[in-house]
Amino acid sequence: QWLTEEMQWSVPEGNFWDDEKLQRRLASRLDRWVSLMRMHGGAQAEMIASAPEEIRDLFSKRIKLMAPLLKAWKGALKAENAVDFSGLIHQAIVILEKGRFISPWKHILVDEFQDISPQRAALLAALRKQNSQTTLFAVGDDWQAIYRFSGAQMSLTTAFHENFGEGERCDLDTTYRFNSRIGEVANRFIQQNPGQLKKPLNSLTNGDKKAVTLLDESQLDALLDKLSGYAKPEERILILARYHHMRPASLEKAATRWPKLQIDFMTIHASKGQQADYVIIVGLQEGSDGFPAAARESIMEEALLPPVE
């Protein structure tokens, strides 16, 4: 019921737990939910009390279903004398707040600040509280915030001064990743969200021809046939989709059908920091797996993650 009604997954009849594809998909979800519970750090009653009132009853039922898995995870950590990532941060905060460690650092530098969570922000606050001379230097870009699913809270970046005090802001407004034609499309898309910081984005290179084209997804094979005629062997073709299960079936025979092409497939999330000569994005349609994302979060994410921004 949880998977079919709330998550809207298609679950095969019979012994669905033997379905390997479903096992992999469910395993990643269970791992995420346990991680969110660990990041919260509180007792079960505290988690339930902190959930929005309109979902509290359902969340209470779901978290009770997850309780044995969380208990097993804690037991495994104890048996191996190990600590997970959330546990490390919680322990560090407690040690700092109890004065068992005095921070000697005057300068704290944080990269990828847009991916910071309230838990990690609390660690920064505890470090700064230990030393009144400490300064915080952060590099982040709210336009690249992609980790809310693991607890990142974008307002810690967009409202930086409210959270960490007054300071100087410096905009790095030149991108070296793409030409101006792609930049124009990216700018229009990102700035439709009023929650994003307004800032200029200038490309180092100016595009002299059309850089973005929309095609029907049925034309993917024909497009690769065309690219096979003029793409150089060293040029990379990167095909992206929202989820792994959206990988085009024709790529199974890519090595024999398009032997001259260097084709890679990745999820959009995993492609951050990558580059390619040609990028093809599939799955740009409405629906449960499409764009924009429908409300597909489970009650666990809705209760334990920061609010959607």
List where the protein language model places each region.
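Conserved helicase NTPase motor core
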Residues: 55-156, 174, 273
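Generic beta-sheet signal
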Residues: 106-108, 136, 235-239, 263, ...
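Conserved RecA-like helicase ATPase core segment
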Residues: 118-209, 307-309
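Short beta-strand/turn micro-motifs composed of small residues
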Residues: 140, 241, 283
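Helicase P-loop NTPase motor core
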Residues: 166-169, 174-263
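Short acidic low-complexity segments
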Residues: 266-270
